[in-house]
């Protein structure tokens, strides 16, 4: 029995002079919740399209459920459920009508299709009143739930989720996270692509960090943060962040890195400083910030996160976006 549901071996994909995916190899074990992380332009979308069979690799092989995707494309499609980032639903239909339409595309019909639709509507936790409304009246979170349900109609073993919580408010994001956890507990193998490191830390037991077409780190969130020797992050909320402030903090002895970070929940921009000895150099940091005429509104000490690991490995933030590949 094959223990890996996804096997990517030396995959490269070129678009004329651009190498979008560069000699990538990785495995996703059966029942794993695997995160593929990286900024726009990292090559995540191209790799996902190759996993779905939408485009072919320039070189290398991909297997899903033990089947080579180029030799057995129809078998792989039976095994895969794909949830794209964009909502793929018909606005003028209600939830049940949408699921009926997509179920027929999978070859389902009659009582089997009706029963499966009712199972999935129960899974989405939408009430009957909502189910009867047109999709055009749904919130973003409700649309995402039906989008996921549509990908589950044929009971796939492997589920690909492309940025499933993009654009959702915190409440709907947490609801989607719970759906993903439930699917994984049922034994589904899930590969989640995201640029949100907190999402990967919360959900995934294995992650690959991708940048400029390459896998630059692979392991559990704990393993990856342990690889970083710096133990602490100092998060400072200043009254303003200027280039002079950034230069001043980067010159402090003992500072490994300093960078801007945007807190999506609080809607504020903070200054993050990575160091091995936070308590020792905190007075120097306060002095440097004051010297450039900046006021400190708050200071917080925390552990290294996956986003901090990414910045240390690449030298840039996830929000320094490039064109998606």
Predicted regions and their residues:
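ABC transporter nucleotide-binding domain
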Residues: 179-276
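Conserved beta-strand immediately N-terminal to the Walker
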Residues: 5-7, 17-20, 281
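ABC-family P-loop ATPase nucleotide-binding domain
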Residues: 1-12, 316-325
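ABC transporter nucleotide-binding domains
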Residues: 13-211, 216-217
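C-terminal coupling/interaction segments
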Residues: 276-325
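Conserved protein kinase catalytic domain
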Residues: 77, 121, 225, 310-311
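Hydrophobic/anchoring residues in structured secondary elements
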Residues: 13, 257-260, 301
């Amino acid at each position: 029995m094959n223990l890996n549901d996804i096997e990517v071996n030396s995959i490269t994909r070129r678009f004329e002079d651009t190498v979008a995916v560069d000699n990538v190899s990785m495995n996703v074990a059966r029942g794993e919740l695997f995160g593929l992380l990286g900024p726009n332009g990292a090559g995540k979308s191209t790799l996902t399209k190759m996993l779905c069979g939408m485009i072919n690799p320039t070189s290398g092989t991909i297997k899903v459920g033990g089947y080579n995707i180029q030799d057995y494309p129809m078998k792989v499609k039976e095994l895969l459920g794909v949830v794209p980032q964009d909502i793929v639903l018909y606005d003028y239909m209600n939830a049940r009508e949408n699921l009926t339409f997509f179920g027929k595309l999978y070859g389902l019909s009659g009582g089997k299709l009706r029963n499966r639709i009712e199972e999935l509507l129960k899974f989405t936790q939408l009430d009957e009143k909502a189910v009867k409304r047109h999709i055009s009246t749904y919130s973003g979170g409700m649309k995402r739930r039906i989008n996921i349900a549509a990908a589950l109609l044929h009971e796939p073993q492997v589920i690909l989720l492309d940025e499933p919580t993009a654009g959702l408010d915190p409440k709907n994001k947490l609801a989607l996270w719970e759906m993903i956890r439930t699917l994984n507990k049922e034994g589904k193998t899930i590969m989640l692509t995201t640029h949100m490191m907190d999402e990967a830390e919360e959900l995934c037991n294995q992650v690959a960090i991708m940048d400029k077409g390459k896998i630059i780190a692979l392991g559990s969130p704990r393993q990856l943060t342990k690889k970083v020797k710096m133990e602490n992050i100092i998060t400072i909320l200043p009254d303003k962040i200027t280039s002079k402030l950034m230069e001043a903090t980067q010159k402090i002895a003992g500072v490994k890195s300093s960078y801007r970070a945007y807190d999506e929940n609080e809607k504020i921009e903070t200054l993050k400083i990575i160091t091995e000895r936070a308590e020792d150099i905190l007075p120097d940091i306060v002095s440097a910030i004051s010297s450039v005429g900046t006021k400190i509104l708050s200071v917080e000490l925390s552990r290294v996160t996956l986003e901090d690991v990414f910045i240390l490995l690449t030298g840039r933030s996830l929000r320094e976006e490039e064109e998606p590949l």
